[in-house]
From Swiss-Prot:
Protein name: E3 SUMO-protein ligase PIAS3
Domain PINIT: 115-280
Pathway(s) where this gene product acts: Protein modification; protein sumoylation
Quaternary structure (record): Monomer. Binds SUMO1 and UBE2I. Interacts with BCL11A, HMGA2, IRF1, MITF and NCOA2. Interacts with STAT5; the interaction occurs on stimulation by PRL. Interacts with GFI1; the interaction relieves the inhibitory effect of PIAS3 on STAT3-mediated transcriptional activity. Interacts with AR, PLAG1 and ZFHX3. Interacts with STAT3; the interaction occurs on stimulation by IL6, CNTF or OSM and inhibits the DNA binding activity of STAT3. Interacts with MTA1. Interacts with CCAR2 (via N-terminus). Interacts with TRIM8. Interacts with PRDM1/Blimp-1.
Gene: PIAS3
Region (Interaction with CCAR2): 1-200
Keyword Transferase: yes
GO cellular component: chromatin; glutamatergic synapse; nuclear speck; nucleoplasm; postsynaptic cytosol; presynaptic cytosol
Keyword annotations: Cytoplasm, Isopeptide bond, Metal-binding, Nucleus, Transcription, Transcription regulation, Transferase, Ubl conjugation, Ubl conjugation pathway, Zinc, Zinc-finger
Family to which the UniProt record says this protein belongs: Belongs to the PIAS family.
Reported modifications of this chain: Sumoylated.
Subcellular location: Cytoplasm; Nucleus; Nucleus speckle
Domain notes: The PINIT domain of PIAS3 is required for STAT3-PIAS3 interaction and for translocation to the nucleus.
């Protein structure tokens, strides 16, 4: 009961900040006014007074009144009424010394002030910094020292001084390296580190909030802030050592001063230390890792057997295990396979790439399982070293239940390579062949080049007109022949007869062509071009033609967009057509559709024009003007 009364007295002397810390530590609501917080704290003390809560109350009270802690005997004296003596005291009551009274008892309400400054933290606590793999410590310039904070102000300031010995100065100067851009760097550096003031385990680097550092009166650059993880969060700097060598006085006679400013936090203290270190490279760490030796392959085989051992309680059993020989970091073949002792997987990563990545940004995280993989726990796997030396043509292996392995070669699927289809101006035409072997038909391929003809060739060498005799019967299709793919300059079914009449260029140039507008839009560069000027170099020949396909009729229909042809256009052709062609050309066979250009000037049968009544054109066929 005496201890409970002592704890109650301690709680009643707390301020709002101590009450909030106590309630937050116990997981209770810490919002409200002081009397509400005090009632919650007393209820906590009566309901569940756990040992951790009791220790927290005593810790807060020691921080609140660091000089004197009241004991049970002192509390009994304070509980007696004035002028009375305790039981068994023969003499009169002696006055209670002021040091035994709590500061709150000497002052009235609302006059709570700190009568004594808080007890300073130890200057050199037993704080040890966690060693950094890329730095080798040569000397300790400032031992881990507490950044003392007072409750009187928000921002704190501390001053430190250190000096270099002549030997240390010589080491720093001889390690200077000139870098591109008129900069210099030192392999041996003066390193400043911050951490939490905790003695339970080696501490990692940790910056106080709102930190500012001045070395010899010059502001020291600090690592940039990390992006906040959530909105409203206070930005933090990445915790890493600070190189203050460029700002230090490299002299054995002049000391160096450090001024640190930071924001104090309730219940959290920080520590500062300065070291003389030598910076190492990834290659040096790789050599040190090789010097540690290669782990026995039997360890990995035992791990494989353990993973592949069948579980009697499980219905699914793993009989094999595939492992890649490619590094998950660089996607290249492993050269120095390593992994951490804390990793439970067999997959290894390349030690050289892992060290190079941590040299740029020290995270020391396993790329396979994303767990911590510090440099001290890295080992080189001897089993993978044997596999890499004996199997150089595969990138994946498979482990068996007995610890053996076999290479996994990729399956090569035979794929037929199809020739890409030809797109362009050049085309192929298969000529029909009668009978014969089908293999010979495939070999006979005629390649047609559509780009050999140009306007310049036409102007230099005008094409000669070929005249063919008129045949009255249709050409029968060859038996067994395939379809013919036709393109420009292919022999068509239009057969020409010898020239029967000529027509001068002056006649064509005098035709009133403006009466027949084109049925399709023409470009501006073609509208002003005289197309008939190309036809005046040679007189045109006319002859009867036999149209043996409906496609050519449609082509002529698009060529003659007009239906009624003026008599003055085809009038001069009537005598020639009537006298020479009608008697020489026999009538078309039944079922053959032909287009006849009559003197009356109309396309018949195929184009729906009126038929002439004269007997002179019976059985005659029209002449087609050949422009090629």
């Amino acid at each position: 009961m005496a201890e409970l009364g002592e704890l109650k007295h301690m709680v009643m002397s707390f301020r709002v900040s101590e009450l909030q810390v106590l309630l937050g530590f116990a997981g209770r609501n810490k919002s409200g006014r002081k009397h509400e917080l005090l009632a919650k704290a007393l209820h906590l003390l009566k309901s569940s007074c756990a040992p951790s809560v009791q220790m927290k109350i005593k810790e807060l009270y020691r921080r609140r009144f660091p000089r004197k802690t009241l004991g049970p005997s002192d509390l009994s004296l304070l509980s007696l009424p004035p002028g009375t003596s305790p039981v068994g005291s023969p003499g009169p009551l002696a006055p209670i010394p002021p040091t035994l009274l709590a500061p709150g008892t000497l002052l009235g309400p609302k006059r709570e002030v700190d009568m004594h400054p808080p007890l300073p933290q130890p200057v050199h606590p037993d704080v040890t910094m966690k060693p950094l793999p890329f730095y080798e410590v040569y000397g300790e310039l400032i031992r881990p020292t507490t950044l003392a904070s007072t409750s009187s102000q928000r921002f704190e300031e501390a001053h430190f001084t250190f000096a270099l010995t002549p030997q240390q100065v010589q080491q720093i100067l001889t390690s200077r390296e000139v870098l591109p851009g008129a900069k210099c760097d030192y392999t041996i550096q003066v390193q400043l580190r911050f951490c939490l003031c905790e003695t339970s385990c080696p501490q990692e680097d940790y910056f106080p909030p709102n930190l500012f550092v001045k070395v010899n009166g010059k502001l020291c650059p600090l690592p940039g802030y990390l992006p906040p993880t959530k909105n409203g969060a206070e930005p933090k700097r990445p915790s890493r050592p600070i190189n203050i060598t460029p700002l230090a006085r490299l002299s054995a006679t002049v000391p160096n001063t450090i001024v640190v400013n930071w924001s104090s936090e309730f219940g959290r203290n920080y520590s500062l230390s300065v070291y003389l270190v030598r910076q190492l490279t990834a290659g040096t760490l790789l050599q040190k890792l090789r010097a540690k030796g290669i782990r026995n392959p039997d360890h990995s085989r035992a791990l494989i057997k353990e993973k592949l051992t069948a579980d009697p309680d499980s219905e699914v059993a793993t009989t094999s295990l595939r492992v890649s020989l490619m590094c998950p970091l660089g996607k290249m073949r492993l050269t120095v396979p390593c992994r951490a002792l804390t990793c439970a997987h067999l997959q290894s990563f390349d030690a050289a790439l892992y060290l190079q990545m941590n040299e740029k940004k020290p995270t020391w995280t396993c790329p396979v399982c994303d767990k911590k993989a510090p440099y001290e726990s890295l080992i080189i796997d001897g089993l993978f070293m044997e596999i890499l030396s004996s199997c150089s043509d595969c990138d994946e292996i498979q482990f068996m239940e007995d610890g053996s392995w076999c290479p996994m070669k990729p399956k090569k699927e035979a794929s037929e390579v199809c020739p890409p289809p030809g797109y362009g101006l050049d085309g192929l035409q298969y000529s029909p062949v009668q009978g014969g072997d089908p293999s010979e038909n495939k070999k006979k391929v005629e390649v047609i080049d559509l780009t050999i003809e140009s306007s310049s060739d036409e102007e230099d060498l005008p094409p000669t007109k070929k005249h063919c005799s008129v045949t009255s019967a249709a050409i029968p299709a060859l038996p067994g022949s395939k379809g013919v793919l036709t393109s420009g300059h292919q022999p068509s079914s239009v057969l020409r007869s010898p020239a029967m009449g000529t027509l001068g260029g002056d006649f064509l140039s005098s035709l009133p062509l403006h009466e027949y507008p084109p049925a399709f839009p023409l470009g501006a560069d073609i509208q002003g071009l005289d197309l008939f000027s190309f036809l005046q170099t040679e007189s045109q020949h006319y002859g009867p033609s036999v149209i043996t396909s409906l496609d050519e009729q449609d082509a002529l229909g698009h060529f003659f967009q007009y239906r009624g042809t003026p008599s003055h256009f085809l009038g001069p052709l009537a005598p020639t057509l009537g006298s020479s062609h009608c008697s020489a050309t026999p009538a078309p066979p039944p079922g053959r559709v032909s287009s006849i250009v009559a003197p009356g000037g109309a396309l018949r049968e195929g184009h729906g024009g009126p038929l002439p009544s004269g007997p002179s054109l019976t059985g005659c066929r029209s002449d087609i003007i050949s422009l090629d």
